[in-house]
A protein has these predicted regions:
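Short amphipathic alpha-helix with an adjacent loop that forms part of the alpha/beta core around
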Residues: 213-224
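Conserved SAM-binding strand-loop segment of SAM-dependent methyltransferases
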Residues: 205-211
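Adenosine-phosphate binding glycine-rich loop
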Residues: 256-330
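Segments forming oxygen-rich coordination pockets for charged ligands
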Residues: 1-190, 198-204, 223-227, 309-330
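ADP-ribose/adenylate-binding Rossmann-like module
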Residues: 189, 227, 232-235, 243-268
Length: 330
């Protein structure tokens, strides 16, 4: 979420005015995100913002600090659609118990929660509230319909990981959709508008190279935090893409293709100055191993690997082990 938007909200509250967050600021409340949801709509965001007072300023200030410190943190939103049900809801017969009362009150709420499960908000909350507030860190929501009368959602306060799809191949078409859906920022690069267009790649950044080949790729720069997937059509420009990704020092680089083809790519990239260490950094073949063959199946294998790389990047070994124990996967 944009820091300037949060600072503007703080200023509005200090002046006694109603702050404004739009659905562009909090996409979970957008028309597309709430379509078919009887309990949430763009108007729900307006209701929450109208309920805020000066007492909510510390919550927003904590969000600003989280952005400055690059924490894994979220602003969360409690949406109440039936106040009586919200405060009187009960645990179900399957999951663990979360106290003897429902939500602490029947009013909407803005709150802060980070990955360390620190919660900041303007009012007391119940144990059942805390359970659902912590779950927004798996966001934008998780188990949000477990208790009646209310629902929950959130917006991340950290930047998403950027994934470069080099090549507008059929696999890239499927991967762009999946990667966007699981929270990556996607950029697709190709040299042919017949393949790289809005119809095939809506809702992602598209960069059409200015040359007939991929030589203009050198005009672009990836961040060391970015992930690069080499998926060029017919593998024609895989060597150039591998060299570019390694020269950019991308965090993750993966290339599609069989061992025979990759051997040829190795000879070409070596001649271009790539070291053996850089070559070994490239995941070959890209994606998790589970028998994927079709473009859609390959995209699932790739995005699963990207999720795993992101997970390992964000959480240390102790945190990952604790998570696995909690799931019963020793």
């Amino acid at each position: 979420m944009n820091k300037k938007v949060i600072l503007a909200a703080i200023e509005a509250l200090e002046l006694g005015e109603t702050p404004v967050f739009t659905t562009e600021d909090v996409p979970a409340f957008s028309e597309d995100a709430t379509r078919g949801n009887a309990h949430m709509s763009p108007a729900s965001l307006d209701t929450i913002m109208a309920s805020l007072t000066k007492a909510d300023i510390p919550t927003l200030e904590r969000a600003v600090r989280a952005i400055d410190d690059e924490e894994l943190a979220w602003l969360g939103f409690k949406v109440v659609y039936d106040p009586a049900l919200a405060v009187n809801n009960v645990d179900n017969a399957v999951t663990r118990k979360y106290g003897d009362v429902g939500s602490a009150d029947g009013d909407p709420l803005l709150f802060f929660c980070n990955d360390a499960k620190e919660i900041v908000c303007s009012r007391p909350v119940s144990d059942r509230d805390v359970f659902q507030m912590k779950d927004v860190t798996r966001g934008p929501s998780m188990h949000n319909e477990q208790f009646e009368g209310l629902t929950w959602t959130s917006v991340a306060l950290f930047e998403p990981v950027r994934v470069w799809l080099l090549g507008a191949s059929d696999v890239a078409v499927e991967l762009a959709k999946l990667a966007t859906h699981v929270g990556f920022e996607v950029t697709v690069v190709d040299n042919d508008v017949a393949y790289l267009n809005e119809r095939r790649f809506p809702d992602v950044e598209r960069i059409l190279l200015s040359t007939e080949d991929f030589s203009a790729l050198d005009e672009l720069t990836a961040s060391p935090a970015d992930y690069v997937c080499v998926l060029t059509r017919g593998h024609m420009y895989d060597p150039e893409c591998c060299v570019w990704a390694e020269r950019c020092n991308a965090h993750y680089v993966g290339m599609m293709g069989c061992a025979g083809k990759n051997g040829t790519v190795y000879e070409i990239v070596k001649a271009s100055g790539l070291t053996d260490e850089q070559w070994e950094h490239i995941k070959r073949p890209i994606g998790l191993k589970f028998g994927a063959k079709t473009p859609a199946e390959l995209a699932i294998a790739i995005v699963a690997e990207l999720i795993d790389v992101r997970y390992i990047q964000r959480y240390d070994a102790e945190a990952r082990e604790r998570h696995e124990r909690g799931l019963g996967r020793e």
